[in-house]
């Protein structure tokens, strides 16, 4: 008992191993398979399947029928598209599954062997597309065939005739999965077998000359030939190998499945089999029925004695017989002969002739056994025998496409009709249309050409032939006019009367060809693209050949002369070539800079001595090598980088490269200018690269030093600018007190005239010193590139008039006549910076008066429109002492002066005016030119091109009234003044007192903040730079307090007050929360103007002063608008004034409300548009402050992408200005007298 106990585990292990091995064998093919979707015929027929009850019950239990297929496809049996499986086998599988009530499943395996293994292991139920020659058929049982399998022999078109019985010495191409090697070796022992993975590859090998003969089944061959190789190969004969047909294969032990499959296949009617064959286009490509007709013993003996039959055909009888340009015989008759070859086993040797007479002569002489295509003619039946006709076709009339050409047979009377000589239609046509004149031609092509050339009016030909020629060679020239009422022409084979056996064989074979096959052949050749050799088609080539022959003869004669000259010139050319080569060698080697030539792979072809000297190598070390191979740079990584640069960036892009590079060679870094140029041959193909470099290390070092020097000079210039600005601040602070006190002393009435004169002198001197500081700052700004112009709409006439008014008194004091000449045509308003233009004109006029002792100074202005712009010239001429050319060259340099006349002595001034003036004009895009000569005088011309602006529809501003004292503001404000400089604090307080303001002063930021918290102020004016709390900090604290919740006072106006002339000072003030910035020194009039502008913008609810509260008159001008503009615009029409102003008030109020809504929505483009609209209303009443605000808002909103505090402030300011404008307009209207409308 112990022994079985010990053996039990070992037996169990063995059993487990066996089961595992079986499972792995079963699993392996399943893993290699791919499940496909079966796509069968759309309409699957129902057939009567005779099965017993057991079979139906077995099928009901099985439910799924699995078909195995394998790669590669065998079209048309197996065709795979992605995961779809279709084809002839798929159609039959669909019929089987449908009629058995089964679900069909398809598994595809990579090879045939794997599919057969899957069948043996039970993974699949059956396999398709197998025949009786399969080498493994002992393990298979085959169903009844569902498709015929006739092996056929295929050869290239035009191949020499080889007996199909043995194929001796031929290379035989076969699909490895089609026929076993033993079967082919027995059938063709003298042939060399070549196996290919698929039938398509085997057939391609024959088509492209890699093999001589292909053997495959007729269905697959027909499909492949018709799809891809119709013009390359042809079926020449059947291969006498029995295959048994294409069947389904099942395991040998699965007899029940075999029985039910056979039951379905046998129940399929023949019509359905034909339908499936035709569904895959296999009914007409080649004959699929190779069953030979029943030949008699004498006929079989005749075929054995005459294996080759000579067939005479017309060279050009398209589309029945023709020879292509590749010398291959084709046409309808050729296809019919191919079918006959398959059914008889005879080989046909084609003999081409040009005419029917030659063809008949060949038959009578015995040189030909039969005619391939001939019209059946009763006259010829006396010596010829005709076969059954294989083409019957009606006769048609072909004419030119002319209006007078015959349109039908009734119009042939009196016309010339061309026919082929000895045509059967000639006697019929002459009997039917005796008035027609008949001319003959050798062949149909010549007859067509006679009509096309006008030698005949019409040609009578079969419809097939006529259509072929007209569509192919005479399109647009000839046309088929109509059918001819003659019996249809019949095309048949013909032999001499004694060839009875041959004619019987031909007739039996023809009768075995179905009408469908014949119709398919005719249909194919109706639209064939065969290229027959016709005189018409090739006459140009023939003419060309004749011309080439004559040209060749001429060239031959010329060649003799050429050779004699060539011999004489050769030595001269050799000497010239040697000279050129020597010149190129000297040119390249004599160049001091390295030059090299490389091929497209980067190998060195040529280099000069400078290249070799740079790296210290010989030519042998670099020629024929790439940069990494030669490694002359000493660094392998750098060598690879340079090699990649040449190949990828120059050779690949094919663009010249010029660049500076830093290269380290043998431990030394050199800066080189490198150039590389790709070059090619005459065809544009890249051949290599020409390159070189120039060592620019020293030049690069000089440039670096130059850059450092420039940076040092720029730093010194910036230090100078900062010094000048700082200096101006230090000078302006005490100057502010001096000028302000002097101005107040001059304004206050006094009886002490001598004191006033002294004060006037001191005031003028201080103003001159201030102008000096301004000039210094202007030149510093210009040199720093931070000088900005502010062009605005300006009336061009105002600019020279203002300069004349300023200098008129000075000119009268010196006894000089100051003249203004204007020649302004078509120009009104222009865009210009009026302040800077006045500065230029003032400098030029002032200099002219300064250096003129007698005579006159003329300011001339000329302006003409030039498109959208205006060409403007200002010219200042004097009769002074004049300036030499040497002095003129110095005048426009900063701080340069030249002496005046000998009597006048040295010229006063700083020497900055002319320099600044020229630079200002250049910034405006113009030129300033001086012309002068000693003793003659000087003329300075300024030429500008200015943008013109449409003239504003408003009245001109009234002339400024000349007053002894400036007017005071119309409101009394509570003002807090802050400055740590006592004189400036006292001055500003007295200026504000003079203007009628209520002033409280503080000498520090801390004191000012305390006073602001205790009292309500309308305006705060603070110095910017103070110890402790600066003006900027004071502004920030005030604005923070105003923004705090619960702040009940009105927001105050905050001015910065500074002597700094830095260009960004105003921005710094606004950034700190100030409304604006005042610059020291400031006069009383300027201070009044700034206060009035601030009051207008802020619309302070301060009660008016006694002066402002007085009843207004028509001459009074309100702060927010111009009454003069309104009166001029309305011609003082009271009704129109009220109507206009009411509309302005209403429109402005609605536009401001809409603007605020758009501002809340952050719709910046529409905000900009609304601001532009508000500007129009403001211009009507000349509301200058409001115009400035809306223009700034319009510009700022353009292109804005997000929130902007600056836009927020502009919108608030604009709303306040609009409210103030409305209040003042209504108050002005109330003061005006009411008039009844007429």
Swiss-Prot record:
Q: Can you state which reaction this protein catalyses?
A: ATP + protein L-histidine = ADP + protein N-phospho-L-histidine
Q: What is its main location?
A: membrane
Periplasmic compartment segments:
332-541
Quote the PTM field.
Activation requires a sequential transfer of a phosphate group from a His in the primary transmitter domain, to an Asp in the receiver domain and to a His in the secondary transmitter domain.
Q: How does it sit in the membrane?
A: Multi-pass membrane protein
Q: Which residues carry this modification: Phosphohistidine?
A: 729, 1172
The segment(s) forming the PAC domain are: 652-708
GO molecular function annotation: ATP binding; histidine phosphotransfer kinase activity; phosphorelay sensor kinase activity
Q: What are the Response regulatory domain coordinates in residue numbering?
A: 974-1095
GO:BP terms for this protein? regulation of DNA-templated transcription
Span of domain PAS: 580-651
Result of changing residue 979 to G: Loss of activity
Record's keyword terms, sorted: ATP-binding, Cell inner membrane, Cell membrane, Kinase, Membrane, Nucleotide-binding, Phosphoprotein, Signal, Transferase, Transmembrane, Transmembrane helix, Two-component regulatory system, Virulence
- PANTHER family tied to this protein: OSMOSENSING HISTIDINE PROTEIN KINASE SLN1 (PTHR43047:SF72), TWO-COMPONENT HISTIDINE PROTEIN KINASE (PTHR43047)
The record's function comment reads: Member of the two-component regulatory system BvgS/BvgA. Phosphorylates BvgA via a four-step phosphorelay in response to environmental signals.
Protein name as it appears in the record: Virulence sensor protein BvgS
What species was this sequence derived from? Answer: Bordetella pertussis (strain Tohama I / ATCC BAA-589 / NCTC 13251)
């Amino acid at each position: 008992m112990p022994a079985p106990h010990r053996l039990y585990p070992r037996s169990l292990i063995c059993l487990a191993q066996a089961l595992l091995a079986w499972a792995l064998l079963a699993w392996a093919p399943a893993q290699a398979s791919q499940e496909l979707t079966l796509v069968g015929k759309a309409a699957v027929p129902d057939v009567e399947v005779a099965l017993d009850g057991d079979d139906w019950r077995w099928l009901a239990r099985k439910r799924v029928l699995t078909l195995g297929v394998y790669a590669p496809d065998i079209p048309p049996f197996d065709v795979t598209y992605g995961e779809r499986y279709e084809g002839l086998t798929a159609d039959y599988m669909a019929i089987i599954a449908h009629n058995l009530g089964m679900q069909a499943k398809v598994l595809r395996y990579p090879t045939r062997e794997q599919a057969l293994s899957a069948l043996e292991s039970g993974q699949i139920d059956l396999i398709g597309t197998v025949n009786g020659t399969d080498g493994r058929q002992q393990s298979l049982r085959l169903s009844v065939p569902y498709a015929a399998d006739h092996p056929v022999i295929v050869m290239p078109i035009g191949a020499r005739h080889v007996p199909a019985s043995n194929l001796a010495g031929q290379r035989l191409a076969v699909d490895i999965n089609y026929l076993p090697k033993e079967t082919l070796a027995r059938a063709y022992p003298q042939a060399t077998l070549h196996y290919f993975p698929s039938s398509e590859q085997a057939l391609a090998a024959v088509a492209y000359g890699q093999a001589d003969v292909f053997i495959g089944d007729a269905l697959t061959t027909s499909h492949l030939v018709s799809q891809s190789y119709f013009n390359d190969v042809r079926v020449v004969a059947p291969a006498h190998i029995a295959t048994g047909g294409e069947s389904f294969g099942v395991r040998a032990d699965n007899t029940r499945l075999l029985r039910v499959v056979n039951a379905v296949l046998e129940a399929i009617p023949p019509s359905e089999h034909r339908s499936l064959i035709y569904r895959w286009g296999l009914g007409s490509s080649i004959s699929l029925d190779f069953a030979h007709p029943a030949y008699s013993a004498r006929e079989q003996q005749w075929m054995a004695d005459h294996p080759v039959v000579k067939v005479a055909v017309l060279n050009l009888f398209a589309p029945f017989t023709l020879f292509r340009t590749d010398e291959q015989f084709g046409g309808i008759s050729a296809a019919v002969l191919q079918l006959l070859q398959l059914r008889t086993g005879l080989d046909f040797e084609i003999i081409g002739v040009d005419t029917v007479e030659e063809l008949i002569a060949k038959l009578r002489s015995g040189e030909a056994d039969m005619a391939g295509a001939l019209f059946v003619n009763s006259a010829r039946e006396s010596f010829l025998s005709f076969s059954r006709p294989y083409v019957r076709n009606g006769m048609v009339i072909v004419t030119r496409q002319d209006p007078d050409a015959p349109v039908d047979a009734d119009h042939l009377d009196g016309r010339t009709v061309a026919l082929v000589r000895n045509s059967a239609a000639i006697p019929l046509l002459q009997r039917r249309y005796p008035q027609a004149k008949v001319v003959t031609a050798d062949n149909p092509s010549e007859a067509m050409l006679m009509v096309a050339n006008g030698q005949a009016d019409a040609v009578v030909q079969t419809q097939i032939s006529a259509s072929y020629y007209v569509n192919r060679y005479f399109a647009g020239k000839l046309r088929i006019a109509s059918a001819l009422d003659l019996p249809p022409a019949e095309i048949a084979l013909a032999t001499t009367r004694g060839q009875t056996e041959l004619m019987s064989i031909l007739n039996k074979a023809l009768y075995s060809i179905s009408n469908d096959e014949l119709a398919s052949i005719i249909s194919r050749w109706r639209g064939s693209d065969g290229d027959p050799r016709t005189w018409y088609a090739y006459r140009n080539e023939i003419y060309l050949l004749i011309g080439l022959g004559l040209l060749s003869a001429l060239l031959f004669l010329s060649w003799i002369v050429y050779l004699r000259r060539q011999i004489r010139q050769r030595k001269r050319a050799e000497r010239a070539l040697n000279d050129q080569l020597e010149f190129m060698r000297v040119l390249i080697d004599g160049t001091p800079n390295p030059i090299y030539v490389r091929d497209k792979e980067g190998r060195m072809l040529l280099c000069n001595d400078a290249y070799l000297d740079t790296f210290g190598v010989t030519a042998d070390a670099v020629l024929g090598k790439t940069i990494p191979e030669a490694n002359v740079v000493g660094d392998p990584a750098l060598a690879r980088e340079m090699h990649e640069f040449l190949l990828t960036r120059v050779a690949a892009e094919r663009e010249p490269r010029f660049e500076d590079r830093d290269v380290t060679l043998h431990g030394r870094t050199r800066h080189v200018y490198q150039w590389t140029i790709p070059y090619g041959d005459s065809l544009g193909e890249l051949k290599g690269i020409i390159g070189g470099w120039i060592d620019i290390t020293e030049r690069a070092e000089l440039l670096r030093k130059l850059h450092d020097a420039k940076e040092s000079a720029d730093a010194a210039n910036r230090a100078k600018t900062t010094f000048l600005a700082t200096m101006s601040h230090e000078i302006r602070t005490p100057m502010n007190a001096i000028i302000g006190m002097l101005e107040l002393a001059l304004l206050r009435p006094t009886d002490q005239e001598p004191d006033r004169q002294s004060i006037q002198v001191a005031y003028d001197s201080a103003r001159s010193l201030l102008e000096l500081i301004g000039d210094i700052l202007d030149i510093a700004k210009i040199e720093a590139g931070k000088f900005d112009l502010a062009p605005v709409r300006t009336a061009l006439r105002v600019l020279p008039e203002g300069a004349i008014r300023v200098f008129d008194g000075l000119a009268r004091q010196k006894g000089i006549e100051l003249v203004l000449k204007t020649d302004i045509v078509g120009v009104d308003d222009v865009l210009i910076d009026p302040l800077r233009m006045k500065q230029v004109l003032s400098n030029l006029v002032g200099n002219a008066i300064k250096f003129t002792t007698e005579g006159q100074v003329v300011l001339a202005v000329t302006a003409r429109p030039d498109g959208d712009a205006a060409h403007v010239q200002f010219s200042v001429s004097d009769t002074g002492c004049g300036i030499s050319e040497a002095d003129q060259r110095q005048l426009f340099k900063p701080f340069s002066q030249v002496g005046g006349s000998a009597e006048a002595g040295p010229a006063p001034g700083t020497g900055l005016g002319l320099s600044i003036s020229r630079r200002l004009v250049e910034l405006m895009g113009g030129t300033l030119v001086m012309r002068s000569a000693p003793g003659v005088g000087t003329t300075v011309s300024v030429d500008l091109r200015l943008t013109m602006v449409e003239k504003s529809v408003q009245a001109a501003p009234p002339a400024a009234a000349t007053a002894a004292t400036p007017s005071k503001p119309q409101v009394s404000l509570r003002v807090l003044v802050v400055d740590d400089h006592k004189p400036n604090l006292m001055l500003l307080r007295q200026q504000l007192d003079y203007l009628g303001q209520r002033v409280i002063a503080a000498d520090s930021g801390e004191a000012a903040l305390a006073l602001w918290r205790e009292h309500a102020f309308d305006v705060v004016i603070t110095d910017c730079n103070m110890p402790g709390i600066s003006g900027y900090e004071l502004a920030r604290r005030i604005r923070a307090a105003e923004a705090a919740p619960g702040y009940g006072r009105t927001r105050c106006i905050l001015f910065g007050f500074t002597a700094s002339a830095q260009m960004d000072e105003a921005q710094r003030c606004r950034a700190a929360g100030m409304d604006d910035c005042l610059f020291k020194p400031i006069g009383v009039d300027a201070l009044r103007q700034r206060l009035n502008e601030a009051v207008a913008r802020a619309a302070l609810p301060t009660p008016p002063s006694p002066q402002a509260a007085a009843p207004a008159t028509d001459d009074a001008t309100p702060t927010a608008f111009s009454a003069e503009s309104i009166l001029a615009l309305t011609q003082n029409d009271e009704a129109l004034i009220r109507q206009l102003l009411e509309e302005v008030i209403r429109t402005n109020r609605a536009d401001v409300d809409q603007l605020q809504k758009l501002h809340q929505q952050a719709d910046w483009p529409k905000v900009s548009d609304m601001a532009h609209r508000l500007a129009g209303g403001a211009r009507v009443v000349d509301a200058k402050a409001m115009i400035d605000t809306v223009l700034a808002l319009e510009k700022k909103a353009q292109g804005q992408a997000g929130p902007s505090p600056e836009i927020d402030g502009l919108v608030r300011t604009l709303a306040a200005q609009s409210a103030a404008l409305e209040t003042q307009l209504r108050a002005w209207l109330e003061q005006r007298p009411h008039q009844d409308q007429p």
